[in-house]
Amino acid sequence: MQILKSSDYKLYSKFIENLANKLTRFYYSKLNKPFKVSNKLKSGYDPVTTADKAFEKFIRNEINKKFPNHQVIGEEFGSKKSKSDYSWIIDPIDGTRSFVIGNPTWSNLISLNYKGTPIIGLANFPILRKFYFNTSSDFSYVSENGKKRRILVNQKATYSSMKLSAAFHGSLSLKKQKKIPQILKRMQFPCSDALSYSHLAEGKLDVV
């Protein structure tokens, strides 16, 4: 479903594509070095790094330069209030735990919403040098090493043939623990942060 005019989609799509490339360059020029880690929680563990904050500041600055009236909501620095119909939702590093241990599956996640409805989404993977892009007009592609390729979900998967990716988070009740062996039989692939969901959109996985 197309929510915006074609010219608006082109404007925001070009901005986000350029931002993806800028984020990868920013990582290699400024953030590919030792960093500090702190815990957001008094009880439990929810890590945040100096790189999380640096990425979010960079993204906010790029948005504010181009669209100063838009609302911006980020994981690390909260919300910038605005009366605009447009809002940007930022997760500067999705997969901070992976980032901390050097796993390359972490990403920069950005969504542009119009009147509360997502219209454009970006998942950028700097280490893998690729990004996934989607619009509400049903156009999706992956850009890898500068080459774009259209992507589609696998609509022919069956229960017996499906490729399932999963992970367990938090504590599980005894009743739920008893169901784990049933899930493990189908769990052929580990869950790799937003990359697993990107692979779902690409048709490489069927269930996440």
Predicted regions: what they are:
Residues 82-141:
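DPxDG-like acidic metal-binding loop motif
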Residues 23-27, 52, 63, 96, ...:
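Residue-level signal for inorganic ion chemistry
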Residues 138-148, 172:
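Short helix-loop capping/hinge motifs at secondary-structure junctions, enriched
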Residues 153-208:
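An extended, acidic
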Residues 32-40, 140, 183-190:
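Short secondary-structure junctions
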Residues 1-93:
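N-terminal subdomain of lithium-sensitive/metallo-dependent phosphomonoesterases centered on the IMPase/IPPase/PAP
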Residues 53, 76, 92-95, 126, ...:
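Generic detector of well-ordered alpha-helical packing
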